[in-house]
Design a protein with these regions (language model features):
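Terminal presequence/propeptide segments associated with secretion/organelle targeting
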Residues: 2-5, 9-729
Length: 729
């Protein structure tokens, strides 16, 4: 089976006819498109980029949701400001607001611990383990039994991999479960904040400019990775030393110009380009509109409840940024979808696939039943999603904590670690602890209670048959309750729990299930009461998941074979694993609403043009003065008569690529990917080379802001290779 799958996918790649700028390619696939890369301008041998422990791939790291890269031999890491936002917020107080004022550690001793649970992951190996995950026995199973067998096999593969201490291993699904790859990563656990610009630079334009062009945002920040004195990953300790990466990126201070080759290496989260037409219809017809509505309500409530309360506003700053980002993203997708022919094209392509399958008896026998089954299975999943959508917004934060703690106590009682749930094995305990510890910095009872009350009122107004009776009962609620009645019951629940206290909450981490059952803490009692129903729903979901995996994998096998027959490529959708995309620096001929063009670069002039002195369009006085006096230093571009701030490129990225280094033809750092344009976010579903543009922060602006404005000379010197053996000294 494995040999057949590999030949099928490889053949699809060799027949590649995708747009030159389309595709999030696995490193091992790059030689297959080597001629295209060379023609586009790559100076490196594409084969070198398949070697994950060599340059440049070894310099590219994951932060577990964002991408970053090593930029010095002393473990200096650069990423986006919005990727480090949680750590900046975590270290901020009303008295010392690093979000507002920025932060610079002049010495190693001044560097601050990142938010609990922060990690730097360095991918060192990727192996195809399809035959181990879907072994002959598992291949015969379906439903919940299949899900359980797949998880058991994954845990076994991961456990073997993690015998190499200091590494985190995961199994990632490709092509809808057709293939599985083992990803082995060095896990660096001591991460520290080195430098971030003030929010008026790192988030200039705020949510108004998010996903928009022209853009003038200095979306960059710096971490440093630390290890024990023996060079191995270790928990935070003052005795730890900077990690010395085998490879790091050099900064190309000359930057790029229009038409230059660029590529992005990173960890894109998820794309949906191979989805069924029914999935497109449900997502854009119901799911995204519901998400936008709920997100808008969340933002309004948080704004109302934090107004005039600085400490609460700081606590929810990272949460608000995250909600706002996806709120605008999903609305942008909906706007692009309206009037488009995406669904019609998806339906036509699906009909053509089915016709191709049905035209041959052998193909019909191999693929027919699963293609027929997948549509009804997806419909079943969508119905569950629709019915339980609001439920996901109703839970108080402390109830979530109580449920996690009780599940942990239950799983911990199982002596065989391999039989524990994924997410609750011993390898996961440090992460669970860190997440529970971090709640204090991102929680406010008034805000949390208002959110729960608002969404519970909506949920309890649904027909009783559409409500989860066990959940409603566990919280002491009843269908049809008014918001005032709900509020009164929530007051009792919050007053009866001590989980908001960190010491109390963390003490539960070491208690057994019997202690939970005996507790009179209101949220713990609710968690215990919900356990049986949680298992019932989990069993239901696992059964459906197993059926979907089985059918979807065969659907993808048929799709690859069909496109093979037409000489078309089928690269895998993004799944948070290391990928490479390439393109060029380019504007657009019709970017603006009036049909006028977008030039590829913005400059410092745009900052002063947008400056209002208030809110999202405030800017530091020192920056404005430097712009007025044309203190461009080494970073001015004569043709622009200014310093370039941001630029556009025809790169294929998505969420998770934030912080990805933009590299030139020699794999030197020329910027950081941090956004896309609003009308191109639909590329997650439907790539259009004419409109899709990535927005990057120009490395020349980063260097200018640090050197000329913020006087972060120690960081600039380290980036330039000066005094790198003693950073910050």
């Amino acid at each position: 089976m494995k040999r057949f799958l590999l030949s099928l996918v490889t053949c699809a790649l060799l027949l590649a006819s995708a747009s030159a700028d389309e595709g999030m390619w696995m490193p091992k696939q790059l030689p297959d498109i080597g001629s295209k890369l060379k023609a586009a301008g790559l100076e490196l041998d594409p084969k070198t980029m398949t070697q994950l422990t060599e340059f440049p791939m070894n310099a590219i790291v994951s932060l577990g949701g964002c991408t970053a890269s090593f930029v010095s031999p002393q473990g200096l890491v650069v990423t986006n400001h919005h990727c480090a936002y949680g750590s900046i917020q975590y270290n901020s107080t009303v008295q010392k607001n690093l979000l507002r004022d920025g932060f610079l550690a002049k010495t190693l001793a001044e560097e601050l611990p990142a938010a609990p649970g922060s990690r730097v992951f360095v991918t060192v190996d990727v192996q195809n383990v399809t035959d181990k995950v879907i072994d002959p026995k598992t291949a015969k199973l379906t439903g919940k039994d299949r899900t359980t067998a797949i998880e058991t096999n994954q845990k076994s593969v991961v456990a073997t991999c993690e015998k190499d201490a200091g590494h985190r291993c995961t199994v990632a699904s490709f092509y809808g479960g057709l293939e599985y790859y083992l990803i082995k990563q060095l896990e660096i656990r001591d991460v520290r904040l080195v430098h971030n610009p003030p929010e008026s630079v790192g988030k200039f334009g705020g949510d108004t400019d998010n996903w928009m062009w022209p853009r003038h945002t200095g979306d960059y920040s710096f971490y440093r990775a630390y290890v024990g004195k023996d060079g191995k990953p270790a928990d935070y300790s003052p005795e730890n030393v900077p990690y010395r990466p085998k490879h790091y990126l050099k900064v190309a201070a000359q930057g790029v110009k229009e038409g230059d080759f660029v590529m992005v290496t990173g960890y894109p989260g998820r794309t949906n380009r191979h989805r069924l037409p029914s999935e497109v219809d449900f997502t854009f017809g119901w799911n995204y509109p519901a998400f936008v509505k709920a997100s808008g309500e969340q933002l309004a409530i948080i704004e109302r409840e934090t107004k005039g309360r600085d400490a609460a506003a700081i606590s929810y700053a990272s949460t608000v940024a995250g909600i706002n980002n996806y709120y605008k993203n999903r609305q942008g997708m909906l706007d692009s979808y309206k009037g488009s022919d995406l669904l019609a094209r998806k339906q036509a392509a699906f009909n053509a696939l089915k016709a191709w399958v049905n035209a041959d008896k052998a193909r019909q026998a191999q693929y027919g039943s699963d293609i027929a089954a997948i549509e009804s299975l997806i419909a079943e999943r969508d119905a569950i999603t629709k019915r339980e959508f609001l439920l996901g917004y109703t839970s108080p934060r402390l109830l979530d904590s109580a449920r996690t703690l009780y599940e942990f106590a239950t799983q911990k009682a199982e002596p065989d670690d391999m039989k524990r749930k994924i997410g609750f094995q011993q390898r996961d305990w440090p992460r669970l602890r860190a997440a529970l510890e971090a709640i204090d910095k991102r929680y406010d009872e008034q805000v949390d209670k208002s959110l729960a009350r608002h969404f519970l009122a909506q949920y309890l107004s649904l027909p009783a048959a559409d409500q989860n009776a066990a959940y409603v009962s566990a919280l002491g609620l009843k269908p049809g309750m008014s918001e005032a009645e709900i509020g009164a019951q929530l007051d009792k629940l919050y007053a009866g729990s001590k989980l908001a206290d960190k010491a109390t909450r963390m003490a539960w981490f070491d208690r057994d299930a019997a202690a939970f059952k005996a507790s009179d803490d209101t949220f713990i009692k609710a968690a215990v009461a919900l356990a049986d129903d949680t298992k019932r729903l989990d069993d239901r979901d696992r059964d459906l998941s197993g059926k979907i995996q089985q059918a979807y994998a065969n659907y993808m096998k048929a799709l690859i074979a069909y496109r093979n027959s037409k000489g078309e490529a089928v690269y895998p959708d993004a799944n948070s694993t290391l990928r490479v995309t390439y393109g060029k620096v380019a504007g657009r001929t019709d970017g603006n609403a009036d049909g006028t063009a977008w030039t590829p670069f913005t400059t410092l002039r745009g900052i002063t043009a947008k400056y209002t002195g208030k809110g999202e369009f405030d800017a530091p006085a020192t920056q404005l003065a430097a712009i007025k006096e044309k203190k461009f230093g080494k970073y001015g571009v004569a043709s622009l008569d200014s310093v370039p701030v941001n630029y556009l490129a025809t790169l294929d990225i998505t969420g998770g690529n934030s912080g990805s280094p933009v590299l030139n033809s020699r794999a030197e750092l020329v910027g950081l990917a941090f956004d896309g344009t609003l009308d191109s976010v639909i590329s997650d579903w439907d790539f259009n080379p004419a409109t899709t543009r990535t927005i990057a922060c120009d490395v020349r602006y980063m260097l200018w802001q640090m050197e000329v404005v913020d006087h972060a000379t120690n960081v600039v010197n380290e980036l330039r290779g000066t005094n790198v053996d003693q950073p910050g000294k």
